[in-house]
Amino acid sequence: MAPNGSNTNRLPDPTGAFATTHWSVVLNAGGEDSSQALVAIEKLARAYWYPLYAYVRRKGHDTHTAEDLTQEFFARVISRNFFARVDRTKGRFRSWLLGAMNHFLAHEWEKARAQKRGGGATLIPLDEAQANERYERQLAVDSAPEKVFDQQWALTLLERAATRLRAAYIADGRPEVYDCLKAFISGGSAPPSYGEAAVQLGLTESAVKSAVHRLRQRFHELVREEVAQTVCTPTDLDDELRYLLTVIRS
């Protein structure tokens, strides 16, 4: 049986209420300094720096400049006066982040270059070599910057959900089940036949089909949880899921 795992962030909850998310904590700070909001925005930044880096690269900046831009942008985001500038009408972190970066590129970057980047601190751990390799591997040559951003955002969500899912199988003592069946959710290489998986795992084909069903179901739940952390309302969640699905399929 696939592991259940913890589900502390599942949204909405059975009562119909929409639970607190990282982004709602930031918006609800209401322009005031909040240690809880700082932690929340830093978690979001650490999770989603790469789509922004890819966007900056696609805007024409080289690897080193894109890293500098991304670091300096987040140095300003994770700052004590950040919350006073958050527009509460921006219901989705993805939309807000792209708009904030465009403003930074247009109005703040030249000023930032005259100062020491991020006060000399690396706030978000960026692996420049890994980021560049990923960018070169995944980027479609004719993609517009905004399309690159949304594509990489969607891929990051899927990767985070898959990482959490594998961790749950490891915790349950069955990593081999995930490793054998992951192609059924990855959309990459062709998955094995049920018969092949049954032989590899020592199960019946019927048991493999059930395991794949549970794997897909839990993966979809985790994707929903990841998206939920970047929005504030059930409507935003459903709209964002639909939009990202079109991005993945495009």
Residues of each region from the PLM?
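Intrinsic, short, N-terminal disordered tails of RNA polymerase sigma-factor systems
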Residues: 1-250
